[in-house]
Amino acid sequence: MSSPSQPLQKIAPSVKLGEGVRIFDFTNLYGCEIGDDVKIGAFVEIQKGVKVGKGCKISSHSFICEGVTLEEGVFIGHNVTFINDRFPRATNADGKLQTEADWKCIPTLVKRGASIGSGATLLCGITVGENAIVGAGSVVTKDVPPDTIVAGNPARVKKSLPVRA
């Protein structure tokens, strides 16, 4: 339980916040850039190097790791997880604990207007196309074409959407 003098958010000094950003309690932001008019729900973590474009909505309990870029107007549902390491290991082949020097961040891009459904997991090294929709609970392992709906584990194209003007 926090006292009135304790912050309910952890926003590191290295965070760049745009105008009109709304951040709910129990968030953890560090080393990221947040564009104008973004809404960040409770219990969200956004790591260093993440770029969140103008007008995005990130729902509660989501994890956005280093290497992720969200373009303008992206919707992230509740409990969405991004992965940035294709082969995560605790130790190297010699048995020594891995350090940051042993790790390679693989970027992920979510393009303008895309929507990611609640409970989805997005593996690294993919692009979610403009206005694409990822169904709730999906596991995205490869690129999602623009203007499509994908769903499932692994996520597959279910439907093409009319192209927006």
List where the protein language model places each region.
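Flexible, glycine/small-residue-enriched loop-and-beta-strand segment within the central core
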Residues: 2-13, 25-126, 153-154, 159-162
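C-terminal/domain-terminus segments
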Residues: 126-143, 147-149
